[in-house]
Amino acid sequence: MAKINTQHSYPGMHGLSVRTTDEDIERIENGFIRTHSLCEDTSSELQRVISMEGRHLSGSQTSPFTGRGAMARLSRFVVSLRSWATRHLHHEDQRPDSFLERIRGPELVEVSSRQSNIRSFLGIREQPGGVNGPWPLARFNVNFSNNTNEDKKEEKKEVKEEKKEEKKEEKKEEKKDDKKDDKKDDKKDDKKKEEQKKEVFVIDPSSNMYYNWLTIIAAPVFYNWCMLICRACFDELQIDHIKLWLFLDYCSDIIYVFDMFVRFRTGFLEQGLLVKDEKKLRDHYTQTVQFKLDVLSLLPTDLAYLKLGLNYPELRFNRLLRIARLFEFFDRTETRTNYPNMFRIGNLVLYILIIIHWNACIYFAISKVIGFGTDSWVYPNVSIPEYGRLSRKYIYSLYWSTLTLTTIGETPPPVKDEEYLFVVIDFLVGVLIFATIVGNVGSMISNMNASRAEFQAKVDSIKQYMHFRKVTKDLEARVIKWFDYLWTNKKTVDEKEVLKNLPDKLKAEIAINVHLDTLKKVRIFQDCEAGLLIELVLKLKPTVFSPGDYICKKGDIGREMYIIKEGKLAVVADDGITQFVVLSDGSYFGEISILNIKGSKSGNRRTANIRSIGYSDLFCLSKDDLMEALTEYPEAKKALEEKGRQILMKDNLIDEEAAKAGADPKDLEEKIDRLETALDTLQTRFARLLAEYSSSQQKVKQRLARVETRVKKYGSGSLSVGEPEPEKPEEQKKD
């Protein structure tokens, strides 16, 4: 430990003498000594400062705290004591938070003892990254303005360096964040890729592709249902064409296998969307009964051929379990065909033939088991050449099956018990199945003739009416011809009746598909809004005119406009014979008269006679329907009126003075009518309110009367709020 010898002669001529070695000073400054006590730290610190001052004043007899620079030395001594006092304070490690660093500014960094002492004395905060070099004591005199300027410059440099470092750190953090974002994006992309991988190829059950596959799979199913029973019962058929049957059998098996893959990829709707997840598709199919039947239909029962031989096609009867595919094909075809009634009849006939075919094969098999020709019921003896042929065997069995199931004609009676049992079952099956089939056929035929019967009923009622009213023969003939034209050209369909079960959206789409192109041909509707055109399309009504019919006559009030769909119309003179112009498909007329354009010289009246040359199909749009549609489109109404006004001005058919004069008297009349209707509604509402008011007044009067009676009986005290009514005497209660 350093020893301190001081002479207490301050402020005398003798200075403080310190005896210590250089090694001790280095150990004290660098901290490579044992743990000191508080007194030892104080002594070593004082010795270090005083020795440094003693070196500068060596050879001088004056006191270190007197003379030139005394104040600076004294201040350094005081600062060294303060720095020593704060040396052992515990400094917390700061959080590596860039946000907090930006908020609270640059940090304070520990520097060498001399620099910290001097700067604390001057009140200067040093930023981190400062220069930790030695501070010459000679610079510190009374006038230390130069030192402060240099400190400020150094501080500015340090601040700049810190800002650069902060920017570098921020860039590094941004790079890290970008890398994290890139990793997140990569993860999202990987998830999307995984989802895309999950979405496998799916067949929409309502698509043409699925229907085409049903057509393919229906062929082997129908083959198995027709040929397996026939080959099992007629041995000659199986033996003579064994190679053909093997080829067809295994081709059908291959199609069966592919059909299972198709079922695994057949989508289904979940919440209105087609499911494309492989696992869901697989679970949806495997949980159905049809999956079990499909698996059973593919069991390799053909392996028994290796032991029993190839003459046992009944081993393949499990292939018949795919019958659901055949029914599904028939259902899809029925919804797609344009002739559903004809298809239903053909489908029922096919079912009848299959039932008769199976019954015939079973009859021949029973005859073979009992013995050919053993009695009159079984098939005759095959040893007879006439009955030994394969074609005769099948046709005879088919004939017997048809007679038995339809109960038409007589068949040989059964002899043995098993024969009786088989005939009884045949009769029951025939009665049940054929009663159902014949009933369905009858209803289908009646449905096919329903439209004709309904139309004929209308014609008959018109004939009876004309006969009752004694209509002329010429007019009656024209009416009958008009009905014949409607029937032959299939124009008897009431579109509203047919489309009434469809939603409004589909009705609009059908109407747009049928009538929109025709409506766009009209000049005033060419630039209209799409919504208005759709409204008008739904209001178009088809009409048919006979030869010689007048569509409109000159001077008639125009309440409709017409668009020619098919046929020819002629603009004729007053005599009805002279033709001025012939109008054909796509032409239109009467569009100006339904707009009520102010100043029109013709008003709303027709300006020409138009007559049908032959049968003509026209679309009619009434004025009321147009105005009803235009109520929701006021701007479109103004545009239509402006277009109509321009057309009239081109043809010099508008009176500009009348248009500028004001409203048309007819328009005023219409407004007056509307005001009258509004006034009527207001009067009814006022009468209702008046009745309610009078009833409420009566109730108030009744309540006031009751209050007055109570006041008279019990006095004013009974009217106090919250006070109960006085009890009535017992005599009054009895009364």
Curated annotation (Swiss-Prot):
Key word Transmembrane present = yes
| Cytoplasmic topological segments | 1-214, 268-292, 336-342, 450-735
Write down the InterPro entries for this protein, in alphabetical order.
Answer: CLZ_dom (IPR032406), CNG_cation_channel (IPR050866), cNMP-bd_CS (IPR018488), cNMP-bd_dom (IPR000595), cNMP-bd_dom_sf (IPR018490), Ion_trans_dom (IPR005821), RmlC-like_jellyroll (IPR014710)
The protein's GO terms of the molecular function aspect are:
cAMP binding; cGMP binding; intracellularly cAMP-activated cation channel activity; intracellularly cGMP-activated cation channel activity; protein-containing complex binding
Tell me which domain of life the UniProt entry assigns to the organism this sequence originates from: Eukaryota
List ligand-binding residues for 3',5'-cyclic GMP.
Answer: 532-654
Q: What ranges does the record give for the region Disordered, renumbered to this chain? A: 142-191, 715-735
Q: Which Pfam families match?
A: CLZ (PF16526), cNMP_binding (PF00027), Ion_trans (PF00520)
Keywords assigned: cAMP, cAMP-binding, Ion channel, Ion transport, Ligand-gated ion channel, Membrane, Nucleotide-binding, Sensory transduction, Transmembrane, Transmembrane helix, Transport, Vision
Q: Which residues lie on this side of the membrane: Extracellular?
A: 237-246, 312-316, 367-389
Described by its record, this protein's role is as follows:
Visual signal transduction is mediated by a G-protein coupled cascade using cGMP as second messenger. This protein can be activated by cyclic GMP which leads to an opening of the cation channel and thereby causing a depolarization of cone photoreceptors.
Q: Name one GO cellular component term.
A: plasma membrane
BP term (GO), one:
monoatomic cation transmembrane transport
What topology does it adopt in the membrane? Multi-pass membrane protein
UniProt keyword annotation of Transport present: yes
Q: Which residues cross the membrane?
A: 215-236, 247-267, 293-311, 317-335, 343-366, 390-424, 425-449
Subcellular compartments? Membrane
- What's the protein called, per UniProt? Cyclic nucleotide-gated channel cone photoreceptor subunit alpha
Family assignment from sequence similarity: Belongs to the cyclic nucleotide-gated cation channel (TC 1.A.1.5) family.
List all Basic and acidic residues biased stretches. 149-191, 725-735
